[in-house]
UniProtKB/Swiss-Prot annotation:
A molecular function (GO) term: metal ion binding
Keywords, sorted A to Z: Heme, Iron, Metal-binding, Oxygen transport, Transport
Gene of this entry: hbb
UniProt entry tagged with the keyword Transport: yes
Similarity-based family: Belongs to the globin family.
Transport as UniProt keyword: yes
Protein name as catalogued: Hemoglobin subunit beta
Function of the molecule: Involved in oxygen transport from gills to the various peripheral tissues.
Length: 14
């Protein structure tokens, strides 16, 4: 399952 751009950005922000 792939994440959405918004979720991806949130995770990358960690």
């Amino acid at each position: 399952v792939e994440w959405t751009d918004a979720e991806r950005k949130a995770i990358a922000s960690l």
